[in-house]
């Protein structure tokens, strides 16, 4: 079953971006928010209520601007929102793993340790012979793609890059680097997407 997935990043409370999201969401089956939807958690509750009002499943990870505990609490209160920090969610043949990766370092040892749970889940599902596509939701983009480039320098996560390559992740939806927004790139077998605040839609 093909799903229309709308992914968006780094909204930072922009009313224009939220209005665009509300229009685009009408055509989506699932919405994925890859962090930094606020500025330092300002107006976090009304923004998340707008996400909830989309009446679609909305998967959210935090970026460096959100308070994770507050986001988790609101996700628990709002019926359409799913808190995805270090969480796995399966929909049909899609295995989705969310992680609020550190956007300010090349190496993220916490991610390298915790992401092994996704590797275990992939192995179990493959043993059953089920067709499977994997999506990593990461605030930090993988190192060495259009998604993490500022001028001529790459500043993404080498931990995310290595994980995607080693485990043949199908899609990596990311954000954080505003200069890399609205880009799609390929990292070996992984399609890397930094959708920016106006979002991008994919049929998967």
Language model features: what each stretch is:
Residues 2, 17, 88-93, 109-114, ...:
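Binuclear metal-dependent phosphoesterase catalytic core
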Residues 8-91, 195-198:
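Core catalytic region of metal-dependent phosphoesterases/phosphodiesterases
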Residues 10, 31, 36, 63, ...:
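Divalent metal-coordination and catalytic microenvironments
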Residues 12-17, 38-43, 64-72, 104-107, ...:
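Active-site environment of divalent metal-dependent phosphoester hydrolases
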Residues 13, 66-156:
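Conserved catalytic scaffold of divalent metal-dependent phosphoesterases
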Residues 38, 51, 55, 139-177:
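Cap/insert and terminal regions of metallo-dependent hydrolase folds
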Residues 57-59, 82, 133-135, 170-171, ...:
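Proline-centered loop/turn at the N-terminus of a beta-strand
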């Amino acid at each position: 079953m093909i799903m229309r997935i709308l992914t968006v990043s780094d909204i930072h409370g922009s009313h224009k971006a939220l209005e665009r999201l509300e229009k685009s969401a009408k055509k989506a089956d699932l919405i994925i928010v890859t962090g930094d939807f606020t500025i330092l958690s300002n107006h976090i509750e009304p923004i998340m209520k707008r996400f909830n009002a989309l009446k679609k499943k909305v998967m959210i990870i935090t970026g460096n601007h959100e308070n994770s505990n507050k986001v988790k609490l609101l996700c628990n209160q709002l019926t359409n929102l799913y808190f995805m920090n270090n969480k796995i969610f399966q929909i049909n043949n899609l295995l989705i793993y969310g992680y609020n990766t550190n956007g300010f370092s090349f190496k993220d040892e916490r991610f390298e340790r915790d992401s092994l749970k996704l590797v275990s889940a992939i192995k179990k599902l493959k043993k059953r012979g089920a067709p499977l596509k994997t999506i990593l939701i990461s605030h930090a983009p993988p190192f060495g793609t259009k998604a993490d480039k500022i001028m001529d320098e790459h500043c993404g996560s080498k931990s995310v890059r290595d994980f995607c390559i080693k485990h043949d992740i199908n899609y990596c939806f990311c954000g954080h680097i505003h200069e890399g927004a609205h880009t799609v790139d390929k990292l070996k077998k992984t399609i890397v997407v930094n959708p920016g605040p106006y979002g991008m839609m994919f049929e998967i």
